[in-house]
C-alpha cells in the first residue's frame, strides 16, 4: 500500500508540473503560427487573393517562412488587424498607411511601382452621355466613392472638390460607398452613379467584362500626384524576418512569375525600397486641407 501511495504521489506531482508549465507559443513563420499578409480590397477580391496567395507561396519558397495571404473586408480592416497583431504585413494604400503609422507604428518597407513611377493620380469619372462637363456640374448628382479610407477613391478627390467650391458632404443628392475601384467604374458605367472617384485609370481593370468602358465612361478631372501604396510591417515584426521577406519580394518583383502575380493583385509593375519620410509630402497636403492624421489616430 505504501508503494502505491508513493507512486500515486509521484504521478500527481508530475501532472501538476506539466500543467503548471505554460506551453511555448509556436515560432512565427511556421505552419502553427504563420506570418499573415493582408491586402486591402481595392479591386476584384478574387483576383487579389489569387495573386496574394501566389506571392505568399513564393515568399515561403524563398525564405522558408510560412506566409498566408488574406483580403480585408474593407480598407480599415487591414489597418486594424495590423494594430491588433492579427496581420503582420499589410499591402496598404497611402492614406491607410499614414494613419496606421501614426496609430500603431506600422512601418513601410516597399513602395509599389506602376508605369515606371512611385506616384499616381486619382480621377473623377462620369458617363460620356451624362452632360457633365465640369466639376461644378456635379452638384445635385449621385456620387460614388470607393471607401472612406481610400486615398484616390475618397480622400484626395474630396480635397480637389472642396478646392473647386464643392462641399462633398452637402452638395450631392446622394453618395454611395462602392467598396472597390472596380465597383465605382461599374456603377458609373451602369448609370447607378452619375460620377465616381477612383485611381487613374481604373477603367482598365474592368475592360475584360466591359470592353467599351473607355468609350462609355470618361475622365472629368484628375487629382494631384499621390505617393503609391505600400508593403508595410507591424512595429514589432522581427528585423531578420523582415529583411528576408523584403529581399524575397524584390526578387519576386524581378521575376516573370512574380510580375504576373503582382499584376493580378494591384496592377503592380515593380517594387522599390521606401522609408516613412517618402510620405511626408502627402501628410503635408492632408494638413493643408485640414485633415489631421494625429486626430484621426486617437
Model-derived segments and spans:
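Extracellular/periplasmic catalytic domains that process cell-envelope and extracellular macromolecules
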Residues: 83, 101, 116-119, 136-137, ...
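An extracytoplasmic/periplasmic, membrane-proximal ligand-sensing/linker region
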Residues: 30-60, 226, 232-233, 237-298
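A ligand-binding cleft/hinge motif common to bilobed small-molecule-binding domains
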Residues: 94-104, 162-163, 187-190, 194-215
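Short beta-strand->loop
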Residues: 107-117, 171-174, 208-225
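Acidic, polar ligand-binding/catalytic clefts
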Residues: 80-137
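Short, low-complexity disordered leader/linker segments with a strong preference
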Residues: 1-32, 297-298
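Bilobed "Venus flytrap"/periplasmic-binding protein-like clamshell domains
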Residues: 32, 37-62, 72, 95, ...
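Short helices/loops that flank or line small-molecule/ion binding pockets
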Residues: 76-90, 103-104, 136-139, 180-201
Amino acid at each position: 500500500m505504501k508503494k502505491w501511495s508513493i507512486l500515486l504521489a509521484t504521478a500527481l506531482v508530475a501532472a501538476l508540473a506539466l500543467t503548471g508549465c505554460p506551453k511555448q507559443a509556436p515560432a512565427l513563420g511556421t505552419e502553427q503560427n504563420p506570418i499573415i499578409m493582408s491586402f486591402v480590397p481595392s479591386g476584384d477580391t478574387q483576383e487579389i487573393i489569387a495573386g496574394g496567395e501566389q506571392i505568399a507561396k513564393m515568399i515561403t519558397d524563398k525564405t522558408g517562412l510560412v506566409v498566408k495571404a488574406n483580403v480585408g473586408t474593407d480598407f480599415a480592416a487591414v489597418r486594424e488587424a495590423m494594430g491588433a497583431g492579427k496581420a503582420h504585413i499589410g499591402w496598404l494604400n497611402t492614406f491607410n498607411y499614414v494613419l496606421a503609422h501614426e496609430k500603431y507604428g506600422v512601418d513601410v518597407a516597399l513602395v509599389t511601382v506602376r508605369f515606371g513611377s512611385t506616384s499616381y493620380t486619382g480621377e473623377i469619372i462620369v458617363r460620356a452621355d451624362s452632360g457633365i462637363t465640369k466639376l461644378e456640374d456635379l452638384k445635385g448628382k449621385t456620387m460614388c466613392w470607393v471607401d472612406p479610407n481610400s486615398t484616390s477613391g475618397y480622400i484626395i478627390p474630396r480635397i480637389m472638390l472642396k478646392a473647386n467650391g464643392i462641399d462633398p458632404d452637402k452638395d450631392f443628392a446622394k453618395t454611395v460607398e462602392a467598396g472597390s475601384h472596380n465597383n465605382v467604374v461599374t456603377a458609373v458605367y451602369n448609370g447607378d452613379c452619375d460620377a465616381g472617384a477612383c485611381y487613374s485609370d481604373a477603367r482598365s481593370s474592368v475592360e475584360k467584362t466591359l470592353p467599351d468602358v473607355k468609350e462609355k465612361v470618361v475622365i472629368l478631372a484628375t487629382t494631384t500626384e499621390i505617393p503609391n501604396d505600400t508593403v508595410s510591417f507591424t512595429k514589432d515584426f522581427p528585423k531578420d524576418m523582415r529583411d528576408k521577406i523584403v529581399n524575397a519580394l524584390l526578387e519576386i518583383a524581378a521575376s516573370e512569375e512574380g510580375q504576373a502575380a503582382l499584376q493580378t493583385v494591384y496592377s503592380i509593375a515593380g517594387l522599390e525600397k521606401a522609408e516613412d519620410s517618402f510620405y511626408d509630402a502627402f501628410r503635408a497636403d492632408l494638413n493643408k486641407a485640414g485633415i489631421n492624421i494625429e486626430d484621426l489616430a486617437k
